[in-house]
Structures are given as structure tokens and as C-alpha cells.
Amino acid sequence: MKSFSLLASAGLATLASLPLTMAGVITPSYFDKHPLSRRQLSDAQVQRELGPQLSRGATIIGPGGPGWDDAIERFDNESRPTIRLVVVPAVESDIATVVKLANRFGIPFLVKNRGHALTNTIGRFRGIQIDMSRLTTITIQPGEPAESAWFQGGAWDKQAIEYLWDRGYVTVTGSCDCVGMMGPGLGGGHGRYQGLYGLISDNLINMNVVLADGSAVRVNATSNPDLWWGMQGAGHNLGIVTSFQSKIYPRKIDTWHYHSYTYTQDKLEAVFGALNTFHGNGDGSTPVLMGLNTGGFYIDPSVSQTEPVVSWVFGYAGPASEAEALLEPFSRLGPAAEQSGDVPYPGVATAMGTGQDQPLCQPGDAHVQVTSQFNVYNATAERALYQLFNRTIAAHPQLADSVAFHEGYSTAAVDRADPSASAVAFRDRKLLMFFDARLKPADAADPEVLGMAREFGRQVRRIWNEGAPDLKPATYVNYAAGDEPLESMYGYDAARLRRLRNIKRKYDPHGRFVYYNPIA
């Protein structure tokens, strides 16, 4: 995602240009017995009140000011939050300061790291955005029983992968270069190394968290253990992670092998049959080093102008000889095109289509998305989905950039983790679906086109869920559209939901964190 110039924006409001609080200076109004109400307070007043309380170098950006457009830029523009002001903290303690002042004035606050929230629920927000883009420091902590690193809350995948790789380490991150680490981690966090090391959340050791009232606490298995449980799986509802300690691992694998296949539609059933065999028909036996395979349907003009192709790419943590032995069934199917190669781990995202500069990571469009999770591909359902896909984009060319993604990660270490140890739901689901109807801004602004895209998504989700009739619908919370039942995001176990709600009431009794797939 395009970054903005902090130096350019700093001219609007920085501590260097604001007086420090000291004896003889008028006390800010939030120390008054009767502070200003939300309706009385202008954005300019908020800036004047907040500025002196922040660290030197922190930045406040107002509407129309230098850097404003970049500061509020998001990956998904279907349902945007309404931002009154942007605060860019220079140190972690600035976050608690912002939260306390926002609470004092009754102004909602929302954290942005890389701006990849997909859920429509953030469209309900209007208030102050806390921008984590300057809090990206990574500090390696060698030690026993496991080596680890501290990551500030703004750390993101490509940055972390490259930093650790250059120093001889790897860790679990998401599979797209451009997303933050902790955002996905609060919902579990799938990634290419999860077969070896588990989800992002499985690797957490400590979190520094700012609570809804602005207090800062250390959270781990023994300090605030109930919050620790909830932050792993439902953390978006419970606090702001300003920094976190996570396990890292010695870099033992020099190169990853990738192999992409493009098939014509007549191979669809054979492809999904081979995938089910490859994944052990849902028994968790996916080869542990085949970190991720992902694919789906889209228009490839080099193959057909009118029929979507079936495209798949595999990423293997090891040499080509080992990977190709596993991929031989897919090569036998007679792809229309294929490509393979070997890259160091920092290059595998680009090789698999999820790199920083590739279309999947570019901001500015609207994304109407749905998701599902199950264990075995239903080829009949996938054929129905393909036919729906073909009919819909033929009738509505504005939807031609839509993609139906299917993600199959290795799950060995994920399966070994105790499901009762965290709030992560549906740990036993092996396959992760994601449909994205991508619209240009002009098309998204047309209510008729947007309505068609949403109906397209609802039909896709229904086909996927009906294709797994023995399972209750499951929603990966990080991919949720926001209209799904609560149980489908956080689990159907009544005791777990009750526990989550109790934690929510304890740590956020006034509902400050309610803009990301809220549990209450």
C-alpha cells in the first residue's frame, strides 16, 4: 500500500510546533470538571487539546491537510470509515493518550495498520483514526526455550519477512506481503509456515495492550490470562496491541519451489479431485512443507476471452525435486499453461501472486467479499460456482475482475495446538474460501452495480456452504463481510461465546471496540 510522507504531513501539527504543558499554561479542557461534549467539540479543538499531550514527533493530520489522502487510504472502499482526524503516534504511549482523550470527549477511535480490513462493519465508524505506520520496530531476542522477537504493532508482513530473513530467521506471517502482522493475528492468522509452526496467534508470547479505558497492560498466559485467551481469535474486540513478542525460528530452508498451473474449464472436476487426494480428503495429512496452495476462477485473455480458467499455484518449502514429486498428479492433467521456479522465502509471495506490487495488494477499489471454510472440495458445487461465475460476468462485465479463491494450507502444527487454549474458532476446518468481486470506484458508486456484486457474493457463499451439508457454515473472521451470524465467526459452542461476552464486558464495558465484527 502506498505510504505517505510523515515529513510532509508534520507541518500540520507536531509537538515541535505546539507548546508543552507546563506551569502557567492553560490546562486542557479535559481536566475540567465538566469537559466539552462530543457535539460541542470541533476537529480543530481536538487537535489543540490533543497535540500537547503527545510525544514530540507525533503527528495529527486534519481533513485536506498534507498527507490526508494517503493517511485515510484503504485497500477496500466498499464500506469506508468516516475519519475526522488522523493521529500518527511516534511512540507506543501516544496510543493510550489518544484513547483517554477520545473517551473524555466521547469520540470513537479506530486503529489502522495497513488498512486491509474487509468487513463492512467498519463503515459504521466516525471518529479519530490511530495510524500505526511509524511503530514498526523489530527487535530480536535470542533466548531459551525459544528465540523470539518483539514487533511493534505497525509491523507488516514484507517488512518482517525481509528483516528476519536477512538475520537468519523466519516466523509465521500472513500470506500477502502487504498486510499487517497483528491484524490477522488477532483473528488467528493463516500463513505459509503454519504447517510447521502454527497460526500467527499460536506463536505469541506477550502482548502490550491498550484497553478501552486507555490503560496499558501486559497480556500473556499468566498476566490477564482471560484477556490472553480472547485476544487470540477475537482480539479486534478487546484492545489495541501496541507491541507483541512472538516466536521466531532459525532459517533452515534456503529456497521455496513454486509451480502454477492454468487449466481450461473441462479439467475442473479432475483438478478438485486431485486436490482432495492431495489434502488427504480433509484428514490433515497435507504435506507439511507444502505451505500453501491457492487457486480459483478468473478470466485469462491469453486462454479465453469468454470462459474463466481454473488456475492454481503451489508453494513448497524445499527443492524442486521434492515438490515436483508431490505435484505430479497436477502436471498429468494437461494444463494449458504452467510456470515454475525457485526463490528465497522473501520472494515466494510475489511468485504466488500476493506480492507487494501485484494487483491483489493494490488499494483503492471496492471489494465485495464472502468467505467459507470446510474440509473437502465438492466438485459438483465448484462446477455450479463456475457456471454462476461464467453467467454473471458475461451479463455484467463490471464484475469481470471477480475472483473465487480457494486456500489450502498445511495444517500439521495448527492441528497440534489445543483448541481450548484460545478463542480461535474452527481450527479443525482445513480449507479456506474467499470470493472477491472487485469493483472500480465508479462502478462501486453505482447502487445497481454494487447490489449485483453483493448478490453475486451471496450466491457464491450459498453454493459453498450447501456443498458441505454436514457442516455448519464457518466464517474466517479476518475475511468476514460483516453480515454473517456471530456463531459462524466465533464458533457455535455456547460456553465459548458466553466466555467471550464476559471478557468483552469486563475489558470493554462501554463498547469502544465495536467496529470490527463485534461480538456484542
Swiss-Prot record:
Cofactors: FAD
Enzyme nomenclature, EC number: 1.-.-.-
Name of the protein in its database record: FAD-linked oxidoreductase OXR2
Gene3D superfamilies referenced in this protein's UniProt entry, alphabetically: 3.30.465.10, 3.40.462.20, Uridine Diphospho-n-acetylenolpyruvylglucosamine Reductase, domain 2 (3.30.43.10)
Glycosylation sites: 77, 220, 378, 390
Range of residues in the leader sequence: 1-23
Induction summary: Expression is increased in rice-extract medium (REM) and is correlated with the production of pyriculol.
Single GO MF annotation: FAD binding
Natural source organism: Pyricularia oryzae (strain 70-15 / ATCC MYA-4617 / FGSC 8958)
InterPro entries hit by this protein: BBE, FAD-bd_PCMH, FAD-bd_PCMH-like_sf, FAD-bd_PCMH_sub1, FAD-bd_PCMH_sub2, FAD-linked_Oxidoreductase, Oxid_FAD_bind_N
Lineage: Eukaryota, Fungi, Dikarya, Ascomycota, Pezizomycotina
